[in-house]
Amino acid sequence: MSNSKVRIYELSKELNLDNKDILEICDQLNIAVKSHSSTITESQAERIKAKAEKLNHQMAGKIHSGSGIDRGQNLAKERKQEILAIHHKPNRPFSSTDAPVGSGQSSPLIEPPRPPMKPQPPSPSRSEVTSPITDEPVSTQEDTNGSSSSHEREPQSPMSPFDQQQPEQNTTDHNQEQQNQLKYNQEQSNQLEQESAISSELSEVNVSKLLRPPVRPSEKPASVPSPSKEKEAKSNEPTKAQPIISPKENKSHSKENKLKLPSDIKPKPNKDKDRDGKKPDKEKDKKSLSPQPKVKRESREQREPRESREQREPRESREQREPRESREQREPKLSTELKRPTPPKPPQKPKQAEVAALAIEPEDVEDTAEDLLEEDPLEALTQKPKLKRPTPPKVGKRQNWDEEEEETEEGKGKAGKAAKAGKNKRRQLLLEDEDDFDSDLEEILEIPTAVSISTARPPKPKSMKPAASGNGASKNVKAPTKAEPGRGKSAERERSERKDRKEQPQRAETLVLDKTMTVRELAERLGIAETEIIRILFFKGIAVNITQTLDFDTIQAIAEELEVQIESPEVKAAATKTTEMLDANDLENLHRRPPVVTIMGHVDHGKTTLLDSIRKTKVAQGEAGGITQHIGAYHVDIEHEGKQEQIVFLDTPGHEAFTAMRARGARVTDIAILVVAADDGVQPQTREAISHARAAEVPIVVAINKIDKPESNPDRIKQELSELSLVPEEWGGETIMVPVSALKGENLDTLLEMLLLVAEVGELSANPDRLARGTVIEANLDRTRGPVATLLVQNGTLRVGDTIVAGPVLGKIRAMIDDRGNKVEEASPSFAVEILGLNEVPAAGDEFEVFENEKEARALADQRSQDLRQTRLQQAMSSRRISLSTLSAQAQEGKLKELNLILKADVQGSVEAILGSLKQLPQNEVQIRVLLAAPGEITETDVDLAAASGAVIVGFNTTLASGARQSADQEGIDIREYNIIYKLLDDIQGAMEGLLDPEEVESPLGVAEVRAVFPVGRGAVAGCYVQSGKIIRNRQLRVRRKGEVIYEGVLDSLKRMKEDAREVNAGYECGIGVSKFNDWQEGDSIEVFEMVMKRRTLSTK
């Protein structure tokens, strides 16, 4: 035997114990096991059995309600309803003198634990009829069990009708039993506290049955709202209510309860006695055992009073299916127990009324009990767990039972059919019995359960609370809920896919072609699949992939193939005003503001000099090459009609590269001054400035400068401007023209007066009492101050400390400096200031706004920076004029040349201008790749980047950081510095041409005419006269006859006066011989040339 192995779960079945109990015993005996499936030796199994028997005896003594070994046996048989079996069996063997605790009695004991739902008086009556001697010991044990159960049951005053019958029949026995019960109750009260953990386990099993106690009030009356509810509660609580009552309360009130209950219960015990003389004793034992598990159930009911009646009803129905004899036996015990608890008495008063109303129902209960006794208890036990699960159908039945008992019987038959579908016919019988038990159980259980729950024992810890009761239903509910969202998602996907399918077939009728696009972008615009475009191009002999960029010609070819009309977008002028700085809230607080005047014109026409003469400063002398290369903002105070007026001037560059700057200046200005030199006339940048001003819809004032020069001709300027629709006022037009001399300061006052008059007509106004808004005029990175931006405030007031967002750049203003270098605390509308405190250099032309909430400002800046990053990526992908697919092939063939540049300038506007000019250079053979373009000084980081990529560093009006020059010398990096933009552009173009391979060019040397032909041997020699240039031996020659080339070859021999000569100059005669050509004729023309390698220039092809 020692070699044989035993599984833990097999041993638990044999001992009718839980696997958990067996594992605990193994831990106590130091037997190493991992789980219920672990194997142990036969000797270890014997040790466990012995230990289990000891524990069962101990538990039986402690808890007469059935928390001992029999409990484990009952659990094994009542697996599904572990609560009933576990607690009742230990009490039965212990209480019954007839049967030992052995396994032999476990089977009969199994039956009584199920009936604990309804104890009936026949048990005491039977004991009296059969034999007082046997009954007395049984009664004592029953009393002890009953006392323990009664303590638990006493709160269940609804069972009083049955209990009252028992005391009347067994008054003498009850006196003895009460004394014994009092003793047992004291012992049990201590033992119950110690074994609360065990009861909690049983309660966990029963939680499903105990789903809802009627009410948690400590008093019984509160728990009994109505007879119908009481009935339901009784049906649900019979097993639960008994175990809940505390032993102390039972002792104190046992006598009173006994006196109250005996009157009504006598007839029921008589029936039981007649049916089974010996069964009542067993049933009593079973009842005593069952109530203790019921107590546990009640405690759980107290904890979980809100459980649905549906869940409780299935449990109660199962309990009701148990033999009624056991219930009757329990009832007398409950009567004794109920006598003891006095506190439940006040609630019992309403209970008595309810009991009187329900007194009619006991007969039905007895009948159903008799039927149940005839049935096999084991079958009922096995059926109980199955019945517990179908809670929803039972709920409907209960409602029917409460309202119409007759209809419920019919419903039970239907329910029985449904139960048969579950495999067991027994379920039908149990369902039929449930009707009778519901009324009685509801009456008996409702009130006492609430009291017992509150008084019997403290609530079990959450960890001990059984989740099994709701598991079945919860799992059933959760599963569909989990599946439902999945189904919903799949349904949503299908819908979205259907929508996409419907949308795709709709092709676009027109295509706005504003930029190059990838295959994917074009497919989205046209509303077709990418494969369709790839197929079209494939048939045209062009292989592309989905991410490849298509040029305009290819896109047009695809559109024609698909019969889609191409439209070119309307090009908006760069100077068009896009944002209105004033909103509706500002209309009530508008104040006049100074005008913003932009000085525009062709390069070297005297714009900056004119501004200097107005401001009485010397800005132009500091400009490199005498040309303005970034916007300057200046304030001028002027006296007009005795008032101090202010004008803000913006000086824009006139060089062609600074188109964006001029457009930006026109966009933020109120009045445009067009400066035209009287000695130079209208130039291209003059026309551009006019177009910018008109796009911005600002009035134009023409200043004809340099009238002090003798060659000046103002009338010619007026004539040229009138051709551009700028007709002077003296000629009947509307354009104000003022001849001025910037150097001598002539007519400057007249010009300023004209500006103020135009400003008055425009009624310029702003709201200074709001947060500032405006435009970034210029921005740069200062080596000491960090990012610096020149802002023009167009509305509101800008103050130090404001949180500002300029495009994607966030910052908090640390300082503001005006045009003369003075620090200011605030800037009112129309004033331009430099600010410090930005975290990056903003782009010139970006609009800025001040926010009160920094969090909101940061969110906006982050969103803009993300959008900007995306647009830059798209531009980088489409900027190359050679597609990525052909890039590698050309690079391998050596046809592709790239010039990598790193551009650093003083301000953002200069960077913008240089990049715009670089794009205008022809890049068919050499492409310019600008790796980095930013304002600021040249740093070592830039040198490292250039070394890694082979780039050239170009600096414009900037300096080198410390260490940058030394690092560049070590790495051999070329750093070019410029202060005039057109020199920078010329050098970059020369560098691009230097990357091109030199080409072989034909260089003519001389021309000779054939005067005579001399045959020599097999060949012939041409006597020639050199007409121009010179003839050199071993050079290329071309023979022309009557204008047509008849031969090209090499001049093999050249003789002068019968001697070989290396070359012959013009005006001399010579003989020319060619080895492969002898067909000379007089009058032929011989052209001599050589091939020379020449540097190529950029072609615009």
From Swiss-Prot:
Which intervals carry biased composition (Polar residues)? Answer: 93-108, 128-149, 157-184, 197-206
Biased composition annotated in UniProt, kind: Basic residues:
385-397, 414-428
What ranges does the record list as Low complexity composition bias?
A: 185-196
Ranges for domain tr-type G come to 592-765
This protein's superkingdom? Answer: Bacteria
Q: Which Gene3D superfamilies match?
A: 1.10.10.2480, P-loop containing nucleotide triphosphate hydrolases (3.40.50.300), Translation factors (2.40.30.10), Translation initiation factor IF- 2, domain 3 (3.40.50.10050)
Q: Which GO terms describe its molecular function?
A: GTP binding; GTPase activity; translation initiation factor activity
Q: Which family does it belong to?
A: Belongs to the TRAFAC class translation factor GTPase superfamily. Classic translation factor GTPase family. IF-2 subfamily.
Protein name (database record) = Translation initiation factor IF-2
The organism of origin for this protein: Gloeothece citriformis (strain PCC 7424) (Cyanothece sp. (strain PCC 7424))
The encoding gene:
infB
